[in-house]
Structure formats: structure tokens, C-alpha cells
Amino acid sequence: MYSLRNKVQLIGNLGKIPDVKKTETGKKLVKFSVATNEFYTNNKGEKVKETQWHNLVAWGKLADVAEKFLNKGSEVAVEGKLVTKEYTDKDGNKRSATEVQINELLLLGGKAGD
């Protein structure tokens, strides 16, 4: 029998310096965003670059690695799962946010534009 999994794999570049936080219980987490680019040719024959931004979060030892080694422009490969959280904003509106909770992180060494 086959089972489907919630699995995401991305290769891209960090948009800014990672944001290091601690929970009320003292657990460290690091949040950062990664841009992925896709290229295609439109119906006019022009090459088009389409950028998607993905919000990621690392916990535990991966948070330590992210804090120590990641910087704006760092090229990374990540694997994780999609997690959607619901919250109430400052105006009392219910909102949801989806992020990738990573369980693997590879530093690829390139910078944006390489």
C-alpha cells in the first residue's frame, strides 16, 4: 500500500538575514524566506523569470545551523513539510499562514546572482 506524505523540497536563495527567536519555553527557532525562480518563454518569445517566496522555519539543531551559517543571499536546499497555522491579527481578524517546517538543510555555497 502506498502512502502520500506532506513533503516539500526547495532550492533557492535567502531574501534577508534569518530571524532568530525563542519560545516561551526557551526553544530556539529560526525563520527565514527563500526565493525560488522558474524561467519560461511567453507567447511573444520573451524569456520570463517568475519568483516565488517561501517562508521557512527551523527548530532545534537546524535552528543553530541556520543562525550560524545562513545570511542574506545564501543558496540553500531544504526539505520539510507544509504547516498552516491560524491566528488572530491585531484587528481581530482570523488569518492563516503557511510555512515550510524544515527537517533537512544543505548549504550550497552560492549567492544570489551566481
Question: Where do the PLM segments sit?
Answer:
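Single-stranded nucleic acid-binding surfaces, predominantly the OB-fold ssDNA-binding core
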Residues: 1-114
